[in-house]
Amino acid sequence: MKKLLIMCGTGIATSTIVTGKVKEWLEENGLQNKVKLYQSKISEELSRIDEYDIIVSTTLVPDNIQDKVINGVPLLTGFGKEEMFEQIKTQILA
Amino acid sequence: MRGLLSTEVETVGGRTMFFDKNITFFGLNASDRTDALRQMALSLKEANLVTSSFEKGVLEREECFPTGLAVGTFGLAIPHTDSDKVIAPQIAFASLKNPVKFRLMGNGEEEVDVSLIFMLALKKSEDQITMLQRLMEIFQNQELLKEFAECKSLEDFDQLLKQVELE
């Protein structure tokens, strides 16, 4: 089972929304048994970021981890949502 | 997809608890984002909804983790900070007389002209997920955002909240 981290700056507002949407999407696509979801704030995760397989962030991340982080903002604005889900799906099935 | 309009929202005396203190600004005059954020945070502080460190928290957080969102051609921002600076959950609302620049969430470089600000003073996440999801549903609807921007009074605002079932 892959570990999927969803993080934002405070761990209470935007990551809550994104977690809810990702959970719904996982269920709709029958992927809920393939991933375990974690919701947190960025400051608590940077030191152990390598423990996760997939990372979605609504907030800015340091340059050194940028390549492995999926931008979660499309789930807040609705623009670019499908592409974002495709990215997650690719990583789940990889 | 689960429809948000069918879900329950916590209410106090018939009114959603997140807007019950009327921390609202219609056509707020602000020189820049810091000025707008200060005025809104001060209002929350004066109503004893947040601690004295809330303003500083919001301003610092906005610089590190910007909260501007571009919804089509519409710009809005959802500034917030850690929950330990919040006494009672509330959302402050402002429509701006002239848009101010915010940096985009999740993107360090681009800016967006913001004409609506929802300042979130929130506690634990479980209590507010329904409300947050509904709010986000509204944020994805440019027509509704325009209606929020056109609110001229508390009456207009109340009516709109009721219409979108946030009241």
Q: At which residue positions do the language-model features occur?
A:
Chain B
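Cytosolic covalent-transfer regions centered on His/Cys nucleophiles
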Residues: 1-167
